[in-house]
Design a protein with these regions (language model features):
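Cyclic nucleotide-binding regulatory module and flanking cytosolic helices
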Residues: 2-57, 94, 103-105, 131, ...
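Cyclic nucleotide-binding regulatory domains
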Residues: 32, 38, 49-119
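A small-molecule sensor/coupling module
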Residues: 40-43, 109-111, 115, 128-162
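A short hydrophobic beta-strand segment most commonly corresponding to one strand
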Residues: 120-125
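Beta1-alpha1 glycine-rich phosphate/pyrophosphate-binding loop at the start
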Residues: 160, 165, 169-197, 206, ...
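FAD-binding core/adjacent interface of flavoenzyme oxidoreductases
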Residues: 195-253, 268-269, 286-287, 321-393, ...
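Rossmann-like dinucleotide/flavin-binding elements
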Residues: 244-281, 366, 372-374, 380-433, ...
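A Rossmann-like FAD-binding core segment of flavoenzymes
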Residues: 307-351, 356-358, 412-527, 570-574
Length: 574
């Protein structure tokens, strides 16, 4: 990967008049860009400082850390940036309106320049004061959070923002970066060099070649050639600044449902919390197209949307969340415990308690050349992005659990046919009944029992698969270019390096599951036995899918996360 500056793109002209909206769209726009009442502004006033701003003054530059928002008392503020990033109908902020979007919650970076379009009087509200206001004023909290989230959703829906991704639908790296940006809810524009008429002009403009892809252009000035997701996260400023001299109350490892549940409850109860996630919020559940048996969502909710809401909620209460950071090592020899991230520089994080919610990963197909097709025909998530890649084609879904069933039903909406491959004799022991009924009734889904993939073929992209039914059955070849594998569960515990007691499958043992021999081997130092979710190391808990004996469901994981926080309070009081 290399990074190099290029010449900035000229600023956009002031916004063109908006096209007529439907009543529903107008109502949504009013929520995204509300006008505060005098009484509401009066409650904000003591938390900020008044500034008189001349026309043309820049209040925030694209790429700078978002440390404040501005409430307009008089005059007008404009968003200014490259047309390719912002589009044509760019809103301005007039009297009673305020700047900002979802980036302010995480301490990210400005997606565009904020500049005074006319002489203005504004109230400048620092990020910490804003977050305190959100935590203490329910009415203003609803207004700010709804506006920030809706503004971000508009950018995503319109493929606008501060990221341009040049790549190909047949490129593994392109898909991985698209998945990372999509699951983290970061707006971007994707240019498929195989189909876009202006692709050569794009390559020339940024001085890159087709062999460099995927290429990420951050903020119109920084070019990343074939970057890792950690490098993309750093360029976009997705992570807050962490004080590595502080001793935190709690470090949570993993931002799946269990980790997010723990973060929300811990932060809302006043604990100083840092959460570390290797990819994107949601974990394995975040790749589910629709979860229909989660309490309170009768119409269902996608795993990504559920995770995104919890992510915002945890930050609302003050949790600091590190994205694209994997934990390399847990130093369990001294207290406070030390948590070292593989992609981090400097000192490890110091903490009095740890909740491990690192989850599980799908088992990889036992096929020799699998790595050639990862992201080029073999996928581990079923979201709208993957569905677009295989519209009107025959596809295969491997696995018999709920995640595989949800994927099959979702993909059947756009695919020509879905072949569901399972090694067992049926779905009854591994899948919820409501999903089984839908799969059996769907005309485009065909279930193949006692069947497994034994071969993958293709040149650059998957073109054909081979499967076998039964141990001694014949091998059949099928012209299938897309395989979704959602089978088995490998616990993410290799990084623990013997620090904790594990079961024979690598899951973390807790509470009553810990034997006398386990505690003796770990040299358990306390008179009391381990708490319900506590591991063989005092003050270190495990929750969710990574815990031995846990129920592998989203609701169970969230519940364990909240229970663990109650235990953390007891541990901190010892």
């Amino acid at each position: 990967m290399t990074a190099a500056p290029v010449a900035p793109v000229a600023p956009a002209a002031p916004a063109a008049p908006a096209t007529p909206m439907t009543p529903a769209a107008a109502a949504r726009q009013a929520e995204a860009f509300p006008r505060l009442t005098p009484a509401q502004i009066a409650r904000i006033d003591p938390r900020g400082r008044h500034r008189t701003v001349p026309a043309g003054e820049v209040l925030g530059e694209a790429g700078e850390p978002v440390t404040k928002i501005f409430v307009v008392v008089s005059g007008r503020l404009d968003l200014v940036g490259p047309p390719r990033w912002l589009g044509e109908d760019v809103p301005s902020f007039s009297e009673g309106m305020f700047t900002g979007e979802r980036s302010i919650l995480a301490g990210g970076r400005f997606l565009a320049r904020i500049q005074a379009g006319t002489p203005c009087e504004v109230i400048e509200v620092a990020r910490e004061a804003l977050l305190d206001l959100i935590r203490t004023d329910p009415e203003l909290s609803d207004i700010f959070l709804r506006a920030f989230i809706l503004r971000r959703l508009q950018l995503i829906d319109q493929n606008l923002g501060d990221v341009l991704l040049l790549g190909s639908n047949h490129c593994q790296g392109s898909l991985h970066i698209r998945e990372f940006l999509t699951r983290n809810g970061h707006p971007y524009k994707f240019v498929d060099l195989d189909t876009d008429a202006d692709s050569q002009a794009m390559l020339d403009q940024f001085h890159v070649q087709a062999g460099d892809i995927p290429v990420v252009i951050c903020r119109g000035t920084i070019v990343l050639r074939n970057p890792t997701i950690q490098q993309v996260a750093d360029c976009l400023g997705l992570n807050p600044t962490i004080d590595r001299t502080a001793v935190y109350d709690l470090v949570i490892i993993g931002a799946g449902p269990a980790g997010l549940g723990a973060a929300v409850y811990a932060a809302s109860e006043g604990l100083n919390v840092v959460m570390i996630e290797g990819n994107a919020p949601g974990g394995q559940a975040g790749t589910s197209s629709r979860i229909e048996n989660y309490l309170g969502f009768p119409l269902g909710i996608s795993g990504q949307e559920l995770a995104g809401r919890a992510y915002d909620q945890a930050q609302k209460f003050g949790a600091k969340i590190l994205i694209a950071r994997k934990v390399a090592r847990l130093d369990c020899s001294t207290k406070p415990y030390r948590v070292q991230c593989s992609a981090a520089t400097g000192e490890p994080l110091l903490t009095r308690a740890i909740i491990i919610a690192s989850g599980v990963e799908y088992r990889r197909l036992a096929v020799e050349n699998l790595s050639r097709f990862d992201g080029a025909g073999v996928y581990y998530a079923a979201t709208r992005m993957e569905a677009q890649l295989c519209a009107d084609e025959e596809i295969a879904v491997v696995g018999g659990a709920n995640s595989a069933g949800q994927a099959a039903m979702f993909l059947a909406e756009t695919a020509k046919r879905v072949h569901m491959l399972i090694r067992g004799d049926g779905l009854a022991s591994t899948m919820s009944r409501y999903l089984i009924s839908r799969i059996e009734a769907h005309p485009k889904v065909k279930l193949h029992t006692r069947t497994e993939i034994v071969g993958l073929e293709g040149n650059g992209h998957l073109e054909q698969i081979a499967w076998r039914t039964g141990r001694s059955g014949p091998v059949e070849k099928q012209k299938i270019r897309h395989v979704f594998t959602m089978t088995g569960a490998e616990p993410s515990t290799k990084w623990l390096a013997g620090c904790l007691a594990l079961d024979d499958k690598g899951f973390i043992k807790t509470g009553a599951a810990l034997t006398t021999d386990d505690l003796a081997a770990a040299k358990w130092p306390l008179r009391r036995p381990p708490h319900l979710l506590e591991t063989s190391l005092p003050g270190v808990l495990a929750v969710g899918d990574v815990r031995s004996g846990s129920t592998k469901r989203v609701a169970s994981a969230v519940g364990e996360g909240s229970i663990a926080v109650a235990t953390v309070h007891q541990i901190l009081a010892e």
